[in-house]
Amino acid sequence: MASKLETLKANLEAAFGGLLQSTTEAIGELTIVVKAGDYLNVATRLRDDRSLGFEQCVDLCGVDYQTYADGAYDGPRFAAVLHLLSVQNNWRLRLRVFAPDDEVPILPSVVEIWNSVNWYEREAFDLYGIVFEGHPDLRRILTDYGFIGHPFRKDFPVSGYVEMRYDPEEKRVVYQPVTIEPREITPRVIREDRYGGLKH
């Protein structure tokens, strides 16, 4: 008798065949990778095909692979990863799709397929700059309206570009260039024979 994962894998291969770039198993779940051009077609069939039945998308997140594998990775930089759930079949699936352009990452929106991804796509846009074409309201959701850049990108500076403070003279919040100075952190070495009551 085939396991649930083997059954799911066989159903995926029967439904998609050559559309799947890869199928891997990790942590008791399958991950499939598809091209951006096939993304909408695959997502629709994942939901509508009764042998798959992924009626829920429980999460969508952006990923920046710029420094993946200590810089040895040379594939596309940005991806969206969806976590899908089939209640009727009691199985889960990860769907990964890479944006073909690293400079302006664009992927189709799947809001029309799973409306739960609305705010997830907005979050991935806000934090990674992934543009979801066809999204009904793609605007920032976590950062401030005038925020510059996308803070979860690997090349975004830790201190940011601007800081916000209240100006008592102007009686309003103002933005200014970051005034935090870069620091070198030097480890503190304690050279005491009996530090903390311990014998050495």
UniProtKB/Swiss-Prot annotation:
Its main location: membrane. Gene3D superfamilies: NADH:ubiquinone oxidoreductase, 30kDa subunit. It is found in: Cell inner membrane. The keyword Translocase applies. GO terms for molecular function: NADH dehydrogenase (ubiquinone) activity; NADH:ubiquinone reductase (non-electrogenic) activity; quinone binding. Keywords: Cell inner membrane, Cell membrane, Membrane, NAD, Quinone, Translocase, Transport, Ubiquinone. It catalyses: a quinone + NADH + 5 H(+)(in) = a quinol + NAD(+) + 4 H(+)(out). It is a peripheral membrane protein. One of its GO terms (cellular component) is plasma membrane. PANTHER family: NADH DEHYDROGENASE [UBIQUINONE] IRON-SULFUR PROTEIN 3, MITOCHONDRIAL, NADH DEHYDROGENASE UBIQUINONE IRON-SULFUR PROTEIN 3. NDH-1 shuttles electrons from NADH, via FMN and iron-sulfur (Fe-S) centers, to quinones in the respiratory chain. The immediate electron acceptor for the enzyme in this species is believed to be ubiquinone. Couples the redox reaction to proton translocation (for every two electrons transferred, four hydrogen ions are translocated across the cytoplasmic membrane), and thus conserves the redox energy in a proton gradient. This is NADH-quinone oxidoreductase subunit C. The gene is nuoC.
